[in-house]
């Protein structure tokens, strides 16, 4: 399935929507489907693994069967995490922590992966690996929801982009080619009156 991307300026509600889908906050209206609530895993800057834990301990906690599932289905992610197994979470870079979280979600057979600006504070190498990882898992059987305001990574992910337009209190599905159109940027940034 294509990656679902929520795009917009800071404070427009992208993260709030993601937290609602994750069950962290209650919806203002309606109901989040129970399958989504029960089968999601959120990767973000405000949820963390205890720093003193070793990656090997995380793998042991997940169990051999679950780790082997990741190894067989997502070999590149397994190999990446396996190389880190002797390190404590404290010694991992931000990007490595996020990949360990994604590994955990895959080992737990979660169907929905929710990421809130997960590439923030990542160097170019880790950002590239993270984006490639998301593309890889989305091409299998994982549904990825991704919050960002970075146009370059949105274009790289090549998913379904839903843009939050605060002036009109609306969310609009857009095409990747619209992301580089200055009129569209003006609508998002300055609240232009229209975009045709």
Q: In which residue ranges do the predicted regions lie?
A:
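Helix-to-loop junction immediately C-terminal to a conserved catalytic motif
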Residues: 22
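Q-loop/switch helix immediately C-terminal to the Walker
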Residues: 51-67
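Conserved ABC ATPase signature
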Residues: 88-92
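ABC ATPase nucleotide-binding domain "signature" region
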Residues: 100-105
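A short, proline-enriched helix->beta-strand linker immediately N-terminal to the Walker B motif
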Residues: 107-111
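Walker B catalytic motif
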Residues: 117-118
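ABC-family nucleotide-binding domains
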Residues: 123
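H-loop/switch region of ABC-family ATPase nucleotide-binding domains
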Residues: 147-149
């Amino acid at each position: 399935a294509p990656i679902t991307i929520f795009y917009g300026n800071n404070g427009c509600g992208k993260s709030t929507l993601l937290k609602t889908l994750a069950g962290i906050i209650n919806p203002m209206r309606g109901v989040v489907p129970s399958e989504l609530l029960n089968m999601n895993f959120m990767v973000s800057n405000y949820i963390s693994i205890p720093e003193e834990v070793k990656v090997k301990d995380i793998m042991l906690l997940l169990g051999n069967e679950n780790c082997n599932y990741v190894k067989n289905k997502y070999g590149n992610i397994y190999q990446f995490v396996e190389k880190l197994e002797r390190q404590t979470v404290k010694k991992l870079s931000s990007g490595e922590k996020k990949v360990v979280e994604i590994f955990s979600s895959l080992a737990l057979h979660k169907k929905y992966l929710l990421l809130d600006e997960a590439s923030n504070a990542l160097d170019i190498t880790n950002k590239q690996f993270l984006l490639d990882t998301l593309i890889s898992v989305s091409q299998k059987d994982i549904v990825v929801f991704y919050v960002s305001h970075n146009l370059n990574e949105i274009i790289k992910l090549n998913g379904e982009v839903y843009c939050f337009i605060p002036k009109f209190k609306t969310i609009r599905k857009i095409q990747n080619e619209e992301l580089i159109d200055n009129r569209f940027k003006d609508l998002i940034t300055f609240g232009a009156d229209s975009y045709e």
